[in-house]
């Protein structure tokens, strides 16, 4: 039996995780960090850092899906990963992972000049704008455009009702429009990813992991 503590259980993602875990016989959501095997965190940066300290005290692996960290907070997380297995990801869906791989493949073969727009849409309650995933996509493009064929990258953010998450990356010039898009039709895709990672991270050594370490 895998015992999971969820930080942010009363939120949208916490409720989704609770719902998905209820369908799995060998996983239990518990209320005590001291007695859990792994922690999943979907909360706010300040709450994440508090739970991080408790994980450090108890040597418990931590899966963080919270967004909106500043650079100082990210440095604290990085330092903590020297002592416990830790994953920080702004999007744990396998679909977004596939989207990122497709963009990397496109950039590795591209020989044309393009401009780029990243358009992201989320629900109105989402605090950070642009989304962490949109920022990650921008960084992926910057890091994989080895020959500087992408002249500009702009992020457009939109907040509307009843949207789980849409990310669209458009490369365009006066001849072509190349579009990569992922839309989350259910919040459960993020929950399933977080649960799968939680099951695996308990076997890992202390380090700062990414989704790539689990979905390859």
Residue ranges and their predicted role:
Residues 84-131:
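Rossmann-fold dinucleotide-binding core
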Residues 39-40:
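N-terminal Rossmann-like NAD(P) cofactor-binding module of classical short-chain dehydrogenase/reductase
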Residues 52, 74, 99-100, 130-134, ...:
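Conserved strand-to-helix beginnings and helix N-cap segments that scaffold or border functional pockets
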Residues 46, 53, 66-87, 94-99, ...:
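Rossmann-fold NAD(P)-binding glycine/threonine-rich loop
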Residues 29, 62-63, 86-88:
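Hydrophobic beta-strand scaffold residues
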Residues 3-7, 12-36, 112-216:
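C-terminal substrate-binding/catalytic lobe of Rossmann-fold NAD(P)-dependent oxidoreductases
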């Amino acid at each position: 039996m895998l015992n999971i503590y969820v930080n942010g259980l009363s939120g949208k993602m916490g409720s989704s995780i609770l719902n998905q875990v209820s369908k799995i016989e060998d996983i239990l959501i518990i209320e005590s960090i001291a007695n859990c095997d792994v922690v999943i965190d979907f909360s706010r940066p300040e709450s994440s850092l508090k739970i991080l300290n408790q994980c450090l005290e108890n040597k418990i692996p931590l899966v963080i899906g919270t967004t909106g960290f500043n650079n100082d907070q990210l440095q604290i997380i990085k330092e903590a990963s020297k002592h416990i297995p830790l994953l920080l990801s702004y999007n744990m869906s396998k679909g977004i992972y596939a989207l990122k791989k497709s963009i990397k493949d496109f950039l590795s073969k591209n020989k044309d000049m393009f401009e780029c727009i990243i358009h992201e849409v989320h629900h109105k309650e989402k605090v950070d704008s642009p989304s962490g995933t949109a920022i990650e996509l921008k960084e992926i493009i910057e890091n994989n455009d080895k020959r500087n064929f992408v002249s500009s990258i702009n992020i457009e953010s939109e907040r509307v009702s009843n949207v789980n998450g849409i990310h669209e990356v458009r490369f365009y010039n006066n001849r072509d429009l190349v579009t990569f898009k992922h839309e989350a039709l259910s919040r459960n895709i993020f929950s399933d990813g977080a649960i799968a990672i939680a099951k695996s991270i308990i076997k890992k050594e202390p380090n700062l992991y990414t989704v790539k370490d689990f979905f390859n």
